[in-house]
From Swiss-Prot:
Transmembrane residue ranges: 7-27, 63-83, 92-112, 122-142, 160-180, 212-232, 244-264, 272-292
Originating gene: ctaA
HAMAP family: HemeA_synth_type1
Keywords from the named record: Cell membrane, Disulfide bond, Heme biosynthesis, Iron, Membrane, Metal-binding, Oxidoreductase, Transmembrane, Transmembrane helix
Residue runs in coiled coils: none
Organism whose genome encodes this protein: Bacillus mycoides (strain KBAB4)
Binding positions for heme b per the UniProt entry: H213, H275
Free-text comment on this protein's domains from its UniProt entry: The N-half (TM1-TM4) and C-half (TM5-TM8) domains are connected by an intracellular loop. Each domain is formed from four-helix bundles and they align in a pseudo twofold symmetry manner. The N-half domain is the substrate-heme O binding domain and the C-half domain is the cofactor heme B binding domain.
Subcellular location: Cell membrane
Keyword Cell membrane belongs to the record: yes
Protein name per Swiss-Prot or TrEMBL: Heme A synthase
Cystine pairings recorded for this chain: C35-C42, C189-C195
Length: 311
C-alpha cells in the first residue's frame, strides 16, 4: 500500500502543477469564457459540439482540476490513515483538500458571475497553497526529512525569522504577479528596469501595477540572497537549510530572468508559463523550510526539557 501511496503522491503533485500552469494558460490566452458562463457543463453541453481553441483550453483546465480533486481527496484519506504518526500529516491533508475546494469554487464563480481582477488574483494564490501542501505531504511520504536529518534540526531565531518572513512575503509577490496578469498589465512597461526610456516612472494604473510587482520581486530576490549567504556561512552542517536556501536562490534567479524575458519577448506563452512554474516551485521549497522551522521550535523545546530533567 505504501508503494501505491508514493505513486499517488507523485501523480497528484504533477496534476496540481498542471492545474496551476493550466490556470496561467487560461488567463494568458483569454480562454476564461471558453465554455461561456456555464459550469460544470461547457456551453450548456456535457461534450461541447463547437470546439474552439479557447473552449479546448478551458475544458482541459476543468478536467485536470476535476482529476486533481479526486486524487487529492484519495491522497488525503490514505495519508491520514497510513501516515498519521507523522506530526504534520493531518494538517497538510486538511490544507490540501480545503484550499483545492476553495480554488475550484472560486474558479466556478469567476465563470458564472465574473470577478474583479483583484479577486481573480487570489485564485492563483489559493491554488498555490494547495499545491505546496501536497508537495509537503509527498515529502513526508517519501521521508525526505529523514534523509536530511531534519527531525533533529535546531535553528536560531534569526534564521526562522527569514524563513517565515520570506515565505509570507513571497505570497504577497505572487499576488502582485497574478494581479499583473488579470489586470492585463504584463506589457504596460515595455522597458526594464524602469517603465520606459521616455517615461521612467509610471503614470497610470496598469503601469503602477507592473512596477509595483517589479519592486516587490527585486526585494524578494535581495532577501533570499541575504538568507542564502547566512545559510552558507552558518548552516553548512544542516543540509536541509543549506540546500534549501541555495535551491530557493536558484529558483528566484530563474524567476527573475524569465520575468525580464516576458517583457522583451512581448509576453510569449513559453515565458509566461515558465514564470508560473518557477514561482510555484519556489513557494513549495519555502513552505518546506517553514515546516522544518516549526520542527526546529519543537526540537528546541524537547532538548531544553530533557536538559532540565537531566539536571
Amino acid at each position: 500500500m505504501q508503494r501505491f501511496i508514493k505513486w499517488l503522491a507523485v501523480i497528484t503533485s504533477l496534476d496540481l502543477l498542471v492545474v496551476l500552469l493550466g490556470g496561467a494558460l487560461v488567463t494568458k490566452t483569454g480562454s476564461g469564457q471558453g465554455c461561456g458562463k456555464s459550469w460544470p457543463l461547457c456551453n450548456g453541453e456535457f461534450v461541447p459540439s463547437n470546439l474552439s481553441m479557447e473552449t479546448i483550453i478551458e475544458l482541459s483546465h476543468r478536467l485536470t482540476s476535476g482529476s486533481a480533486g479526486i486524487l487529492v481527496t484519495l491522497l488525503c484519506i490514505l495519508s491520514w490513515k497510513y501516515y498519521k504518526h507523522v506530526r504534520e500529516t493531518k494538517t497538510l491533508a486538511i490544507l490540501s483538500f480545503v484550499f483545492l475546494v476553495a480554488q475550484a469554487l472560486m474558479g466556478a464563480a469567476a465563470v458564472v458571475w465574473g470577478q474583479m481582477p483583484a479577486v481573480l488574483a487570489i485564485h492563483f494564490g489559493i491554488s498555490l497553497i494547495s499545491f505546496a501542501s501536497v508537495i509537503l505531504l509527498t515529502c513526508l511520504i517519501f521521508e525526505i526529512d529523514q534523509k536530511f536529518d531534519a527531525r533533529s534540526l535546531i535553528m536560531d531565531k534569526k534564521m526562522k525569522f527569514h524563513i517565515y518572513g520570506v515565505t509570507i512575503y513571497s505570497y504577497i509577490v505572487v499576488y502582485t504577479g497574478a494581479l499583473v496578469r488579470h489586470e492585463r498589465a504584463t506589457l504596460a512597461c515595455p522597458d526594464f528596469p524602469l517603465c520606459s526610456k521616455s517615461r521612467p516612472m509610471p503614470t497610470q494604473l496598469h503601469e503602477w501595477v507592473q512596477m509595483g510587482h517589479r519592486v516587490a520581486a527585486m526585494l524578494i530576490f535581495a532577501w533570499i540572497l541575504y538568507a542564502m549567504i547566512i545559510a552558507i556561512r552558518h548552516y553548512k552542517q544542516q543540509r536541509v537549510v543549506y540546500w534549501g536556501w541555495i535551491i530557493s536562490f536558484i529558483l528566484v534567479t530563474l524567476q527573475a530572468i524569465v520575468g525580464i524575458l516576458v517583457v522583451f519577448t512581448n509576453a510569449s506563452l513559453a515565458m509566461a508559463l515558465l514564470h508560473s512554474l518557477f514561482i510555484s516551485c519556489l513557494f513549495a521549497v519555502l513552505c518546506y523550510l517553514v515546516m522544518i522551522g516549526t520542527r526546529s521550535t519543537v526540537n528546541a523545546k524537547e532538548t531544553e526539557s530533557t536538559s532540565k530533567q537531566t539536571k
